[in-house]
Amino acid sequence: MALLEIIHYPSKILRTISKEVVSFDSKLHQQLDDMHETMIASEGIGLAAIQVGLPLRMLIINLPQEDGVQHKEDCLEIINPKFIETGGSMMYREGCLSVPGFYEEVERFEKVKIEYQNRFAEVKVLEASELLAVAIQHEIDHLNGVLFVDKLSILKRKKFEKELKELQKKQKHE
């Protein structure tokens, strides 16, 4: 397994619309395993393939259990996802491994139902609510070249751009 480099905003790579996965082979399995290792090392709960430079419609989500630990066997590997149903509305404070250090409230569906494939190309259906529903929507957005900061109000977006410039200035002087 290998740690992969996470691509950061404002890289144009993050705006790529990912392509459907067609080969469910050992290479794909290795990519999923590397993505999981990278996500855990980066203290994230979700990671889309495009965030590590792979323009493929796949993502992983591994929510921590009540003890705060993310168990590998709980990791969802979601390939070629499609929304079947969505419902409700909620605000959730989101962050992103590609936009480190910035968190903001984003409006999301409260519940989602998706169809996807696992690493063995088996078709699955998943109903999710609350944090899992938010994470699924956030990661699927990545597959479509959309970041959570794109969903902010104009005022919050200006605040984000200002904070980003200040952070970049600070990093140049370190």
From Swiss-Prot:
GO molecular function: metal ion binding; peptide deformylase activity
Cofactors required: Fe(2+)
Active site: 139
Keyword match Hydrolase: yes
Enzyme class: hydrolase
Record-given protein name: Peptide deformylase
Cofactor note: Binds 1 Fe(2+) ion.
Positions annotated to bind Fe cation: 96, 138, 142
EC number: 3.5.1.88
InterPro entries, per database record: Peptide_deformylase, Peptide_deformylase_sf
